[in-house]
Amino acid sequence: MSSLGDQIRDWHRGVLAVAREDWDSALCFFSDVREPLARMYFNRGCVHLMAGDPEAALRAFDQAVTKDTCMAVGFLQRGVANFQLQRFQEAVSDFQLALAQLRDNAVIDYTQLGLNFKLQAWEVLYNMASAQCQAGLWTKAANTLVEAISKWPEGAQDILDIAMDKVQKQVPLQLQQVPKGEVFQPPRRYLKHLEPMDFLGKAKVVASVIPDDHNAQPQQRSQAEHAGHQPSSSMCKRVLSTTGGHTSPGLYDSLLASRRPGPGPSEVSSGSEGAATKDPESLVTVTVQCHFTVPLKVPRGTGLSSFQTLLAQALLHQTQTGQLSYKAPGEERSWIPISTEESLQSIWRNVPVGPGGLQLQCQGVWGRPVLYQVVAQYNYRAQRPEDLDFHQGDTVDVLCEVDEAWLEGHRDGCVGIFPKCFVVPAGAYVEAMLVLGPQPGDQN
């Protein structure tokens, strides 16, 4: 099963194929998208029209308007396909449906949805008159043009005047349609995250906490041993599990860290560092739960050892760019992002003494900062590939406020958008649960 990233990538490749007029490749890429949206069926229909196959285009536009019954531009293009098949009555019906979906608006701007096209009401009426001309209904065609002219479309008065003159002379009209080469494009905010990162030759292992690791540099190992750091198997436990090509939340690290860390090793002498290590009160157990999805480019046939090395380098990069969060004492659900150095130092000062230690979470969000966290009030099932689904009580990291109604967030290694009305700020959810108590059932 392809991931969201793979589907967006195929969508983008299909758009590029349309731009170079490679119709077969475009259809192949658009057809590879799992559970296609109405926009994807629309794209297929446009490609079939450009390739000169109106019959296949008609089937694709049928699926598009079935998926989205309010898709005015879909009805417009289906009318164009029927017109090319000389089904003029069906074309008139489709243009009427397109006009109905305009809902008395003069224009629908599809640019914000990824299609560089503005559907004008006068164009739909013009096409309706054109189909009526082909059906021999010249009087109806003239009346339709009168209705189009009455809307006083900006910049189209001359076109409609010429069209009226042609109809009076019983000269057929040419159709208006979506310009050649224009199809729905994927959301721009996803495109910048498509390219996998090349980790070959860029990451270096400067130190290791793995016992008997022969890859660490001798000088660094001797410094660590002299400072009293003797990593053992109990200090580092890594469990890596994969499902469906994605790294699932299965990477856990338990290690010892200073409660109030001072300067780095290069700024502290080995003697003072060793003294600090021997003081048990200066140490606290930190458990880090990591969630990563790692994209890799590897040569076909790469050996297991080489692949594990590349994966280790990729994980090293992810830990450097991932979002750290901590679980406050007594909190079972809420993870609070650590966004600044001051935040971390405040956490060190408030870590309680005891075996519980400090619980951290590191999530791969491609280096994007977490604005705040929200908690789901209801279940939300993804309706489209770009959506993020969750269940009631799940905590979601908010990465971006898309608009007044939608947020972009991250949960369990997945990034997507979701309705703002399904979530509340983490603190508000906790307060509501304390006041109201658990609520039976949920809402989809």
From Swiss-Prot:
- GO terms for cellular component: cytoplasm; NADPH oxidase complex
Q: What's a Pfam family this protein contains?
A: SH3_1
Tissue specificity comment: Widely expressed with a tissue distribution similar to the one of NOX1. Detected in colon, uterus, prostate, small intestine, stomach, lung, thyroid, aorta, inner ear and salivary glands. Expressed in colon, small intestine and aortic smooth muscle cells (at protein level).
UniProt biased composition (Low complexity):
258-274
Q: Which UniProt keywords apply?
A: Cell membrane, Cytoplasm, Membrane, Repeat, SH3 domain, TPR repeat
Q: State the compartments where it is located.
A: Cytoplasm; Cell membrane
**Would the keyword Cell membrane turn up in this protein's UniProt record?**
yes
Q: State what this protein does.
A: Functions as an activator of NOX1, a superoxide-producing NADPH oxidase. Functions in the production of reactive oxygen species (ROS) which participate in a variety of biological processes including host defense, hormone biosynthesis, oxygen sensing and signal transduction. May also activate CYBB/gp91phox and NOX3.
Please report the name of this protein according to its UniProt entry: NADPH oxidase activator 1
